[in-house]
Amino acid sequence: MVNVHTKFVWVLSVLPFYLFTFLPLNAQLARYRYDFTLNRSDFVDSIAIEWERGQVFLPVEIGGKTYRFLFDTGAAQAVVYADSPIDGCRPAGLIRSQDATGAMDTVQLVTLPPLTLGQLTLTGCQATIHRRPVAGRNIDGIIGFDLIHRGLSAKMDVRNRLLILTDRKDFFRNEQGFSARYKLKYHVPYIKVNPAGRYKELTLFDTGSRSLYGMSCQSFDACRAKIGAEADSLIEGRSLGRHAIGHFGSERLSEVLFLHLQRLSAFDHAFCDVHTLTTQGESHLGAALLNYGAVIVLPHKKRICFQPYNQQVQTTVNNQQLDIAFVPEGGLPSVGLIWEQGEPYRLGFRQGDIITKIDDTPILSFTQFVTYPFLIGREYLFTVKDARGISRQIRWTRQKKR
């Protein structure tokens, strides 16, 4: 048993969460639609939001019942879950869907009953039905980018816990900030970012992801091809593992690069001292951006405006590197990824370890692990089992990740 008092960081909160794009393949499949109707015009509405574990949640009313939906700009359309169906949904065919790991499948499409968000009611809004990727979380569904694609300008301001929606094209004309044009691919927004040197890439603006920035493996290869040794200098570690969980399962086992970006440029604004890693899914600029400023999306101009809270041309991020991540393996919590320079590795955690017990409590499912009532500052005794079936114990103390 390793008996060392150290930091236990709850890392599930930084896993990339959802990316959905819809790719019709033939006449038998339904097509993407955003022609739902609105009950109001010439309006401005301020909606109170929840900002929890680095994501934006909206109160949505359907059939007189209030639901809690994630606002995910990386999702082309709304999503509801098979294990908690919403009454009144009408089948609308099948559609091809791609998740955060790049996996694709054909899923059921439905038309939702009238949906009310603030003072706005949407009629004819479509949603896909998915299995819940991580059970035990209080999420009833997803509102996707079609809300904005429909023509509504939006301002996300987590400091004031507000989402402002309007159909007035000039409502935000006097707002100041750093603006960038976005391009729609598969009905979701991509902006150009500069992670290092002369390399630039189109990156998904994805509030479904909790991270500030994640770089696809393919993008890093392209970056290395363009700037050579300068790209290699970004690497602060390598590991064989997986960390992203999508609706169709966890990503496959592969090499993950741990990166330290001195300067990530987006919206003509510099984010300095950024720790991140590579992913098998899309490169993305995620919801952690909202920690540093408000964001305005203007669909009629196809522009996204970033308003830094510090009112400066650059922001120092200075975040911690992800040192361990957990994924489901056979329904149980498993160490999907571990950084060899991190504290969990020093304590004895290894990739592939299965968590079987915390203190005296047997862990029987990934859901139980995700919802375990950890307390910051308390030490826990983890019992883990490796691939050979050998068990060992590790003491680990949870502290809040900066």
Regions found by a protein language model. Name each.
Residues L25-R402:
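Pepsin/retropepsin-fold aspartyl endopeptidases
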Residues M1-R31:
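Bacterial Sec-dependent N-terminal signal peptides
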